[in-house]
């Protein structure tokens, strides 16, 4: 672990520093510590611009460990693939990992089964599940799965729209960053 001090534009400084790390760890602000101004979107800006994985720890996280029970939110994208492989050192040491896919209806096969098989070949204790959205958003379905599994880490690909479109429409990454159910490991 290394701590650094730098001055300047917060986004530029963090992005530059993150490029020389294995993992950038940020705490989510809360209460009087809610970021304002340019640091408001720092976690999403950092994951999109640094080329490095980012771990966002919720302000109210009280767990004693991170990475023992892991949920991977899988959609088959290059971002999800990147997150999966960036988190491999954590996944290989985890007690239990669940790959979830989320969709509006039942499927004949579990879309994340191939991904789970790939992880099992790396010695990961893994299972796969398909979660039905029902009357909730994709982000809510993911959060429910994290809580139901007792996960202490959520791994996912940070898929981003332009800031304007994301402000208007939201987005799964945006929703998870605003209300993470557990520490959140993101890659882009």
What residue ranges belong to the model's regions?
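Conserved residues at beta->alpha junctions
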Residues: 5, 74-75, 103, 133
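Charged helix-capping and loop-helix junction motifs
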Residues: 38-42, 111-113, 168-173
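Intrinsically disordered or low-complexity boundary/linker segments at protein termini
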Residues: 12-101, 179-188
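Short, small-residue-enriched loops and turns at beta-alpha junctions
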Residues: 32-33, 104-109, 133-136, 162-163
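Redox- and metal-dependent alpha/beta enzyme cores, enriched for Fe-S-associated oxidoreductases
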Residues: 76-129, 140
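Short secondary-structure boundary/capping elements
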Residues: 6-9, 38, 79-82, 137, ...
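Structural beta-alpha unit
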Residues: 1-24, 121-154, 159-165, 174, ...
